[in-house]
From Swiss-Prot:
Residues 496-514 have a biased composition (Low complexity). This is Far upstream element-binding protein 3. Keywords: Acetylation, DNA-binding, Isopeptide bond, Nucleus, Phosphoprotein, Repeat, Transcription, Transcription regulation, Ubl conjugation. GO terms for biological process: DNA-templated transcription; intracellular mRNA localization; positive regulation of DNA-templated transcription; positive regulation of gene expression; positive regulation of transcription by RNA polymerase II; regulation of transcription by RNA polymerase II. It comes from Homo sapiens.
Length: 572
């Protein structure tokens, strides 16, 4: 032994003795395992024949046997399917999952219930555990089912005429269906006469889809199911594409769609949203613009609320648009109706419809059209009502010295946009004597016959009422718009007062434009005399002077615009 301590190697004989001793211990353990009665038919853990020794049976030690028995029991975990009545799943799960948690704790078996029955009267459950724990779980589940069947009130709650239907609600929509404080699900139950239960807890993991159980008459259950699915669809269609048949309409509300020309969108919204807030507060509705598709000459505003309030808000919006047209000169587009051309309706269904053209400008002038930060092209879009954009990918064989712009809109809008682009690039049309005289804005009509109507006899939006859910309730406007002196028109005019120029500053540009105000005044005087000479049951109000003043303002405005454009081109 001293030699071993000093690190010398042990003799070969001692190594052989150690191996024999270890082998002897292995044989003893194998003999004990083989001597266990209920393991006699099983395969031994260690086969002594591998080492060339026979099996020797030894007395069983109690401690070792108990440990080995526990290991054997751990290996006998199985899975079994068990079915329970679909109508009683809620009773088995219990409030907050208390019942099913108690069953699992008492039996030692894990219970997983399928989320839906797929229309069959029984719901499959998966039981996982030892055979003893599975049997215990079956016994406890059977007790609950028997107690529910024989208990009082069960048949009162679910009779032969009632049906139960479950729909799986996405986890992100559970709160939407329940509502704040359970308000939405309460309204659904009151309106449909069914009972709804959202199964929040149970074996389902957190964040998973939750089943909504609907109990009641078959027809009412189906109606409630459709209403729930409609709420979910509404949430998914939050981009407001298409006319929205929204759930609030069933609760006493509704929505209409009002078309707003592009140039008037900013006017309806107002500075920092002040105007649209004022409209909402005054009418008691909610207004939201649909996303801009970049193509249509109009933007759609969704007005949501009671029908009468929606109509009131639509009327206010139309007043703002008409006021803006009168004030900023866009009224010529609508005023052109009845001047012999019959053009200028803002609606998409106007004569000619929405068109698209390609307009070419020199490459070195492209920056003048776009402007710093896109200011010029935005101004062109606002003033014309058309949509102008630069073609990013020109045709392969196109001239590199030219740039192409795409203009979309009705013919009048396209023509105005072309005129504005020519101003920016200094085109030949800029200095022509009749540059603006050829546009629908300021061109005087030929002497009309007696049946010619005044330029604004039908108002700016003749088709607006038809667009509002197909309910034409609009009243034709006769003569100049009277609302210019009302609150909404004056509000917009007040915003525009700082930008007005002194009349003396407009005198020079006016001299370059032919003055048609006198001709229009004479024309309306003749019309007035002819109308007074004819026998009428009731004489309409005389708008002669008002129309004369209106056309003086039109000539003054476009004369000023032309003068500014000429000065700008001379500076360049």
């Amino acid at each position: 032994m001293a030699e071993l301590v000093q690190g010398q190697s042990a003799p070969v004989g001692m190594k052989a003795e150690g191996f024999v001793d270890a082998l002897h211990r292995v044989r003893q353990i194998a003999a004990k395992i083989d001597s266990i009665p209920h393991l006699n038919n099983s395969t031994p853990l260690v086969d002594p024949s591998v080492y060339g020794y026979g099996v020797q049976k030894r007395p069983l030690d109690d401690g070792v046997g108990n440990q080995l028995g526990a290991l054997v029991h751990q290996r006998t975990v199985i899975t079994e399917e068990f079915k329970v009545p679909d109508k009683m799943v809620g009773f088995i799960i219990g409030r907050g999952g208390e019942q099913i948690s108690r069953i699992q704790a008492e039996s030692g078996c894990k219970i997983q219930i399928a989320s839906e029955s797929s229309g069959i009267p029984e719901r499959p459950c998966v039981l996982t555990g030892t055979p003893e724990s599975i049997e215990q779980a079956k016994r406890l589940l059977g007790q609950i089912v028997d107690r529910c069947r024989n208990g009082p009130g069960f048949h009162n709650d679910i009779d032969s005429n009632s049906t139960i239907q479950e729909i799986l609600i996405p986890a992100s929509k559970v709160g939407l269906v329940i509502g704040r404080g359970g308000e939405t699900i309460k309204q659904l139950q009151e309106r449909t006469g069914v009972k709804m239960v959202m199964i929040q807890d149970g074996p389902l993991p957190t964040g998973a889809d939750k089943p909504l159980r609907i109990t009641g008459d078959a027809f009412k259950v189906q109606q409630a199911r459709e209403m729930v699915l409609e709420i979910i669809r509404e949430k998914d269609q939050a981009d407001f594409r298409g006319v929205r048949g929204d759930f609030n309409s069933r609760m006493g509300g509704g929505s209409i769609e009002v078309s707003v020309p592009r140039f008037a969108v900013g006017i309806v919204i107002g500075r920092n949203g002040e105007m649209i807030k004022k409209i909402q507060n005054d009418a008691g509705v909610r207004i939201q613009f649909k996303p801009d598709d970049g193509i249509s000459p109009e933007r759609a505003a969704q007005v949501m609320g009671p029908p009468d309030r929606c109509q009131h808000a639509a009327h206010i919006i139309s007043e703002l648009i008409l006021t803006a047209q009168e004030r900023d000169g866009f009224g010529g587009l609508a005023a052109a109706r009845g001047r012999g051309r019959g053009r200028g309706d803002w609606s998409v269904g106007a004569p000619g419809g929405v068109q698209e053209i390609t307009y070419t400008v020199p490459a070195d002038k492209c920056g003048l059209v776009i402007g710093k930060g896109g200011e010029n092209i935005k101004s062109i879009n606002q003033q014309s009502g058309a949509h102008v954009e630069l073609q990013r990918n020109p045709p392969p064989n196109s001239d590199p010295n030219l740039r192409r712009f795409t203009i979309r809109g009705v013919p009048q809008q396209i023509e105005v946009a072309r005129q504005l682009i020519d101003e920016k690039v200094g085109g030949t049309n800029l200095g022509a004597p009749g540059a603006f005289g050829q546009s629908p804005f300021s061109q005087p009509p030929a002497p009309p016959h007696q049946n010619t109507f005044p330029p604004r006899s039908s108002g700016c939006f003749p088709n607006m009422a038809a667009k509002v859910n197909g309910n034409p309730h609009s009243t034709p406007v006769s003569g100049p718009p009277a609302f210019l002196t009302q609150g909404w028109g004056s509000t917009y005019q007040a915003w525009q007062q700082p930008t007005q120029q002194v009349p003396s500053q407009q005198s020079q540009p006016q001299s370059s434009q032919p003055n048609y105000s006198k001709a229009w005044e004479d024309y309306y005087k003749k019309q007035s005399h002819a109308a007074s000479a004819a026998p009428q049951a009731s004489s309409p109000p005389d708008y002669t002077m008002a129309w004369a003043e209106y056309y003086r303002q039109q000539v003054a405005f476009y004369g000023q615009t032309l003068g500014q454009a000429q000065a700008h081109s001379q500076e360049q």
